[in-house]
Amino acid sequence: MTATQNHKMMEKIICFLQKTDMFTMVNIYTNGHHYSSDNYPEKEDTIVCKTKYGEYYDMGECDVEKIVEYANKDTITMTFEGPLYYDYNGYSEHSHHSYDKLNQIAEPYGLYAEQGYAWSLAFYK
């Protein structure tokens, strides 16, 4: 995947999570950067980004392979707690809705989501 494709897919994921109130305690790693649903005020160089549904934060450069054991630096890797964790792992009333939707978002790019830990996933060809 190109950097542009990774970024477009990431923004589609963020929009879906924002629309469904699951964009809390979510971290996304792509193109050598760390993006987050949460702002850390002590981090002065954070860049505020926006979608039509809300804000997300570019936390700067990051080597995802130093953060998550099961990562794919060539696409998108995610870590999460909160609402996405509960839905993705089958603990909510709409269990696995996020699993299905994330795979629908990934499919046009020839990718699928694979869970590493209960709190992480990465996209693969």
Residue ranges and their predicted role:
Residues 1-21, 25-28, 114-125:
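Short, extreme N-terminal segment that most often corresponds to the first beta-strand
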Residues 35-116:
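Acidic, low-complexity, intrinsically disordered interaction modules
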